[in-house]
Design a protein with these regions (language model features):
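N-terminal basic/disordered segments at the start of proteins
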Residues: 1-26
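Active-site beta-loop-alpha junctions enriched in small/polar residues
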Residues: 7-11, 28-30, 49-55, 75-79, ...
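Alpha-helix N-cap and loop-to-helix initiation/capping positions
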Residues: 9, 27, 31-32, 56-59, ...
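Glycine-rich phosphate-binding active-site loops on the catalytic face of alpha/beta enzymes
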Residues: 23-32, 67-80, 124-131, 173-190
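Conserved anion-binding
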Residues: 41-140, 144, 148-155, 212-228
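Catalytic cores of alpha/beta
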Residues: 12-20, 53-67, 106-114, 162-177
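N-terminal, polar/charged subdomain of small-to-medium soluble alpha/beta proteins
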Residues: 199-368
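C-terminal helical cap(s) of enzyme catalytic domains, especially alpha/beta-barrels
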Residues: 35-39, 88, 134-135, 182-219
Length: 368
């Protein structure tokens, strides 16, 4: 289950964030941790941010822990990440240790291994105010980071000017936490993002009589639920002409080099019960594009037929998808493109509650 953390700097922001549904708070460097911890009153864990520029990490952790922080996240300096991590190893108290890396450091698996050896339990990629996370890191890089954290027993988290459209994309990777800057987003946008992230309080069971289930909201949270769609009307969402490099082909030489492959996907989506104008009411086409990008960036395929089936299967895991048509074209075979077009409908036996893309890093059935 992915937790939603609110980056806050005052007790007022902490109260507002908890009211909006935050699972935890991360306090800015310099915030009054003792005052915030008293205001929170045990309703959630309090994490404090620290930075090497403000003194010895071990001393900062001790002071912040004494003030009420259960966890301290050290923002690693870009010049000496390894040195900062080793400094964390000097701390031996009860406060849990976490760290934040810049996006360009997220692919350094040696740093991930060092973080684990130095007592860090939670590693985050954070742009640190330098723009949107997904402008710095694509889904494959973030997936690799998540996998590296899992391999070393670390929780993984993402931060960096996150917005509502980022939620379904990042949830595909099943991170342990997403951190949202509450002061930047504001209460309304924060609440919208909260609605897109599943929580332990989310009810996935059938509603009482007269209660309406917002299936589109459930979908954008990354879950599917049983629907008796029958002849329910559908709308078509499409991605056409998406060209990505991948290793594909029956010949060994094809499996060791990248070649361009073009995808066109049309998905018939069960129409929402009401018209909406935000991310809670739509099927995000990023689920399609990011799913293709992840497959292309992480696997080697022999046949276009296999690729088409995998893409169709990924999309059909989404419970609002009634049918999908997938066209896959190899563009570098002889004088013309070659490929396949398949059409698949969601089989009845797939109609249980599940997290989407369960093959990606530990995603599984949610707790009901």
């Amino acid at each position: 289950m992915t937790s939603m953390l609110a980056r806050i700097s005052s007790t007022a922001e902490a109260e507002a964030a908890l009211e909006a549904g935050a699972d935890g708070v991360e306090c800015a460097v310099g915030a009054d941790i003792a005052e915030i911890a008293r205001a929170v009153g045990g309703r959630c864990a309090v994490t404090a941010l620290a930075h090497p520029a403000y003194g010895s990490p071990a001393d900062q952790i001790s002071a912040l822990g004494a003030a009420g922080a259960a966890k301290v996240r050290l923002i690693l300096s870009e010049k000496d990440c390894a040195g900062d991590l080793r400094a964390l190893a000097l701390y031996s108290g009860p406060v849990r240790l976490a760290a934040a890396l810049a996006p360009q450091q997220g692919d350094d698996r040696d740093l991930t291994a060092l973080a684990a050896r130095c007592g860090v339990t939670d590693l985050m990629i954070d742009t640190g105010g330098a723009g949107r996370l997904l402008d710095h890191c694509g889904p494959v890089a973030l997936s690799d980071f998540t996998e590296s954290c899992r391999a070393h027993g670390l929780a993984c988290a993402f931060a960096g000017a996150l917005e509502a459209p980022d939620m379904p994309r990042l949830l595909l990777l099943a991170p342990d936490a997403l951190a949202i800057d509450f002061s930047m987003s504001g209460p309304a946008a924060f609440a919208q993002m909260r609605a897109l992230i599943p929580s332990e309080k989310t009810r996935l069971t059938a509603p009482a009589a007269g209660k309406r289930v917002d299936f589109s909201l459930m979908s954008e949270r990354g879950f599917g639920v049983d629907l008796d769609e029958g002849d329910a009307p559908t709308d078509c969402i499409f991605v056409r002409g998406l060209t990505v490099p991948m290793r594909i082909g029956a010949y060994a030489s094809e499996q060791t080099r990248l070649q361009n492959v073009r995808f066109t996907v049309e998905a018939d989506i069960i129409r929402a019960a009401h018209a909406g104008d935000d991310m809670r009411d739509v099927f995000s086409y990023d689920i399609i594009t990011d799913g293709i990008t992840l497959l292309a960036g992480r696997e080697v395929f022999a046949m276009v037929e296999t690729v088409a089936e995998r893409v169709a299967g990924l999309i059909l895991r989404h419970r609002r998808v009634a049918a999908v048509r997938v066209k896959v074209e190899k563009l570098e075979v002889g004088p013309a493109g070659v490929g396949i077009v398949i059409e698949r409908r969601r089989a009845a036996e797939t109609a249980d509650i599940r997290q989407l893309f369960p093959g990606l890093r530990g995603a599984g059935k949610p707790k009901g």
